[in-house]
Every structure is written in structure tokens, then in C-alpha cells.
A protein has these predicted regions:
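Terminal, low-structured helical/coil segments at or just beyond the last alpha-helical repeat
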Residues: 3, 71-91
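Short coil turns that delineate tetratricopeptide repeat
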Residues: 32, 65-66
Length: 91
């Protein structure tokens, strides 16, 4: 599975978001409760400015692994939304 994580990270760094998303979704079909895959799914959502999708993925990742880097990523998105969309976002 580590190879999959590394491949997804490389695809994201190369700007190949669609390919990264396909791979993550394919793997989530097999292992739906993988916190790292969910974290990566959240990163893909954030890269696309799909804030709700990113938050959903990060929340699921944190539920599965409270020490996941998704916790910090989720907090960063919440801060972005609170700053730019005060009228839409009220935590």
C-alpha cells in the first residue's frame, strides 16, 4: 500500500490530479477505511478547491486515525473558509 501512497503523492506533485484521484478512488473501493487514502483524497479535493469534499475526506481520516495529518489539513481549510467566506462558513 505504501507504493500506492507514494504514487498518489508523486502524481499530485506533478499536477496530475485526475490520475491521482482515479487511483485513490480505485483503492478506496478495496480498502474504504484507509486513513491515509482518505487524507490523500482530501488533498486532492483541496487542490481542486473542493473545500467540502476535502473536509469530508479529512474528517473521515481523523475519525479513523486521530493522529492523521488530516487533522492539520482540516484545520487549515477551516481557517481559509473562515477568512474568505465568513458569511458562508460559521464553525
Amino acid at each position: 500500500m505504501q507504493q500506492t501512497y507514494d504514487t498518489v503523492r508523486q502524481l499530485l506533485e506533478a499536477g496530475k490530479t485526475a490520475e491521482a484521484e482515479r487511483l485513490v478512488l480505485q483503492e478506496l473501493e478495496v480498502v474504504p477505511n484507509d486513513a491515509t487514502l482518505l487524507y490523500l483524497q482530501g488533498r486532492i479535493g483541496a487542490k481542486r478547491a473542493d473545500w467540502q469534499g476535502a473536509l469530508n475526506a479529512f474528517n473521515r481520516a481523523v475519525q479513523l486515525d486521530p493522529d492523521s495529518p488530516a487533522r492539520e489539513a482540516r484545520q487549515a481549510i477551516e481557517e481559509i473558509l473562515a477568512f474568505y467566506h465568513k458569511d458562508y462558513y460559521n464553525p
